[in-house]
Regions:
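Short coil-to-beta microelement around the adenine-binding A-loop and adjacent beta1/P-loop entry
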Residues: 14-15, 73, 128
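The feature captures the beta-strand-to-loop junction immediately N-terminal to the Walker
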Residues: 33-35
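Helix-to-loop junction immediately C-terminal to a conserved catalytic motif
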Residues: 48
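Conserved ABC transporter NBD signature motif
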Residues: 56-67
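ABC ATPase NBD coupling module
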Residues: 65-80, 110-111
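Short coil-to-helix segment of the ABC ATPase nucleotide-binding domain corresponding to the Q-loop/switch region
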Residues: 92-101
């Protein structure tokens, strides 16, 4: 669950996000739309503290992540985000690209991550591409 209260973000005198209040329930799908330059990406980056909000608070799964004492790296282990511009590592196989994060973050062992990756690849009929 995510609660956003009074979230604002400014770059100098340019306020790009102004006083956003939002509640996102578990499993809820949310779409953020708007014209170029309206603050969509900045808002998303603030949600996982890739950008520090100027003011306001964000509560994720009962923990205020905007609290300076919050362990944001631990919190991010339980968050997912797809970046606007993302790329795969060309020097890694499909399987290695999929398993990189769960192994590096110690969420899964290599064996567990590979089994889950193969399960997901099979769901989309791409298991034969695992070593590509």
């Amino acid at each position: 669950m995510i609660y956003v209260k009074g979230l604002s973000k400014s770059y100098g005198d340019n306020q790009v996000i102004k006083n956003i209040d939002m509640h996102i329930a578990p499993g809820e799908k949310v779409v953020i739309i708007g014209p170029s330059g309206s603050g969509k990406s900045t808002f998303l980056r603030c949600l996982n503290l890739l950008e520090q909000p100027t003011s306001g608070s964000i509560v994720f799964d009962g923990q205020e992540i905007t609290d300076p004492k919050a362990d944001i790296n631990e919190i991010r282990r339980h968050m997912g985000m797809v970046f606007q511009h993302f790329n795969l590592f060309n020097n890694l196989t499909v399987l290695d690209n999929i398993t990189l994060a769960p192994i590096k973050l110690k969420i899964m062992t290599k064996k567990e991550a590979e089994a889950e990756a193969m399960r997901l690849l099979k769901l989309v009929n791409l298991e034969e591409k695992a070593s590509a």
